[in-house]
Amino acid sequence: IIHVLRCFDNGNIVHVDGSVDPVRDKEIIDTELQLKDLETVETRIKRVEKLANVGGDKQAKIEYGLLLRYKEALEQGKSARVVELENEEEVAASKNMFLLTTKPVLYVCNVDDTSAKEGNQYVDAVRNAIQGEDAELIIISAQTEADIAELETYEEKQMFLEDMGLEESGCNRLIKAIYSLLNLETFITAGEMEVKAWTYRKGWKAPQCAGVIHTDFEKGFIRAEVIKYE
């Protein structure tokens, strides 16, 4: 879940609640997601309770126990992701529940262009609020990104970023943060006709990566020629 928070003052852009408070905005969305998950959990509990307690279904027992822990956390105003999964069976059961608050979260602090590099007091408040959460935070100025998008050449964009004191665009940093949060990386294949990027999960070995290109490449894997590049 990408959670965009307003972290800038601008009298011409009126906030729906009349003031700028990104922590309040975060908590409102958190509550809405938690209430939706609580509704989902209570519905599933009704469905699996009998199977777990009467039918003796092993999978139902695992799911039922996890659902009760999720319910307790959600009723306390916590997200489901704070519940620690005890084994692989619970990990599998959790994935099948599709709860919103078990998903990884990336907080995007949208600041004015003068705060694009270091952030501001609003960003500091968000950082303090998410301590203890398994979440990422990045700072982006949507106005700066809009200005960059209007430039035509790569050189113009790089010069603009340098003038702003930035090493790369917010879009690039957003993509990298998402990849990191989802435990993903990229490898590149190069040939005479094209260069292409492929996504894989961190920790995969070369045969698994080859399978991303084509399943036959994984089955008949021989070797990979690896080239370092900057």
Walk through the language-model features, giving the residues of each.
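Conserved P-loop NTPase nucleotide-binding/switch module
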Residues: 3-33
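Active-site-proximal flexible loops/turns
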Residues: 13, 32, 44, 117, ...
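C-terminal-of-GTPase-core extension/linker across diverse P-loop GTPases
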Residues: 47-230
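Amphipathic alpha-helical coiled-coil segments with heptad-repeat character
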Residues: 19, 26, 31, 38, ...
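Alpha-helix boundary/capping and short turn/kink residues
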Residues: 7, 35-38, 57, 116
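Generic hydrophobic/packing signal
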Residues: 5-9, 33, 45, 49-52, ...
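Glycine-rich phosphate-binding loop used to anchor ATP phosphates in small-molecule kinases
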Residues: 1-5, 85-87
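Conserved phosphoryl-transfer catalytic core
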Residues: 38-46
